[in-house]
Regions:
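A cross-family phosphate/adenosyl-ligand binding-site feature
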Residues: 2-129
Length: 129
């Protein structure tokens, strides 16, 4: 009888949610997506708010399409029915960078009116980092 080889198992990738909002410092969110792209054990999921898209144009030379291309999966900011909005969609972590004051206040008050705040609310509820 042969022993199972633990190296034959393909471990699922760690899902990391990166949300970019309209605060200044969009370069930090872009850099995080660039770093995650180099990590073979990570699957990045991105949500970019309309204000972040505007900030992106004002603060960088990058386009929205270029930033979206850094993520494995991109979600529409308005789609509160997306997988990220469910606690049954397991993620390893969520990072909101940059995080606007509006987004921070929405999370503090559980005011989930878009996918970023809904996913953040779920992440907090589930006790995930």
């Amino acid at each position: 009888m042969t022993e199972p080889n633990p190296t034959n198992h393909i471990l699922p990738k760690k899902r990391v949610v990166v949300a970019l909002t309209g605060a200044t410092g969009i370069i930090y969110g872009i850099r995080l997506l660039e770093v995650l792209q180099t990590m073979p054990d990570v699957e990045s999921h991105a949500v970019i708010s309309p204000a972040a898209k505007r900030t992106l144009v004002e603060e960088t030379d990058a386009t929205v399409k270029q930033v979206e291309a850094l993520a494995d999966v991109v979600y529409d900011y308005r789609d509160i029915g997306a997988a990220l909005a469910s606690g049954s969609f397991h993620t390893h972590a969520m990072v909101i960078v940059p995080c606007s004051i509006k987004t921070m206040a929405s999370l503090a008050l559980s005011f989930a009116d878009n996918l970023i705040t809904r996913a953040g609310d779920v992440t907090l509820k589930e006790g995930r980092p």
